[in-house]
Each structure stands twice: as C-alpha cells, then as structure tokens.
Amino acid sequence: LPHLGLDSATINDVEFGLIGVPWDAGTTNRSGPRHGPRQMRDLSTMIRAMNGATRIKPFEMANFADLGDAPVNPADIQDCMYRITEFYKKIKSKGIIPMTIGGDHLTSLPVLRALAADEPVGMIHFDAHTDLFESYFDGFKYTHGTPFRRAIEEGLLDPKRVIQIGIRGTMYDGCLLYTSPSPRD
C-alpha cells in the first residue's frame, strides 16, 4: 500500500485507509498489542495483488493507502483516547473508510467516538469476549473489557444493531448475561 499523510496532495483520492493504533494501556493482563500495527505491516508485505480463488484484485477495485499510526500517549488513557478520536475525525471528514489495526480492545472506544459522533452505529464483533463489563478491578471503567459498554452508554453503539460472534469463556461473579430468544429481538 502507498503510505500517505493526512496532508498529502492525493489524500482526497483515498477510499480506504489503513491506520495503526499502537496502544495497549487499557489491557490488564497481557501487554503487547501496541506492537500489532507494526507486525501486521511487516507480515502484509507478502500479500499478493490478486486473490487466487476469486481472481479479484482488490487494490484495483478501490483506492487503498496506509495512513500511518494515530497519535498515542501511553502515559495517559484519557489524553490518548482524545488524540485517537481527533485523528479519526480528520479521517472521517475526508470521507475515508478506516481499517484499524492496533492495540488492545479499548482502542475501539475513541475510534467509535469519532465515527459515530453524528449517529449511533451498528457493529459486527468477532471475539471471544463481549467487552461489555461495567468495570474491571474495582472500578476501572476504561479497560480492554469495557469499551462497548462505554460506547453504548455514550450513544455511539446501537445495541439493537450489535452482533457478537464467538463469545465464550468464564464470567466474573455478579455479571449479567443478556440473551435474546430470536436474532430479531
């Protein structure tokens, strides 16, 4: 992918932008997701221009670019989320559809703050965990296990348009599990 900055002369031609968010201050047990954007970029050097099974050449169908990394502050969660949100607002204002690679799950909240600022969005979420906890470790509201609870509370996610696939694992005492008898409920 070509690498472009937001001030590039050709930025308005970009339809899909790859954005790294090298941040993992919201994780409680396994640091390292901040290395995800670099690792994904390193591994993607082997991606071929055409899908062998479908013969589709996605990079000829749309204009993709690597827009670099969102600015982060590893020392301050609130400031970091503000910086990420402001960066994504610029992406949104240019009409670019972001594809985010990055840090821990809390990264989703500032991205949603930018993308859903005008109206709530739906989400298809593939994960082993819901990330809907009220808090972690006696009251911490901004962790890798809480971003979608915060997003719903802030009116960013419409819970009637959220689908979570692959949920498994144990739960903490006192957690509520909400289920629906029908996918339409």
Predicted feature residues:
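Acidic active-site catalytic centers that drive phospho-/nucleotidyl reactions
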Residues: 69, 104, 127, 131, ...
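Conserved catalytic palm subdomain of right-hand nucleotidyl-transferase polymerases, strongest
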Residues: 119-135
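Active-site glycine-rich loop that binds ribose-phosphate moieties when present
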Residues: 107-110, 130-134, 138-154, 165-166, ...
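Active-site catalytic microenvironments for nucleophilic, acid-base chemistry
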Residues: 114-118, 154, 182
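Conserved small/polar residues in nucleotide/adenosyl-binding loops
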Residues: 178-185
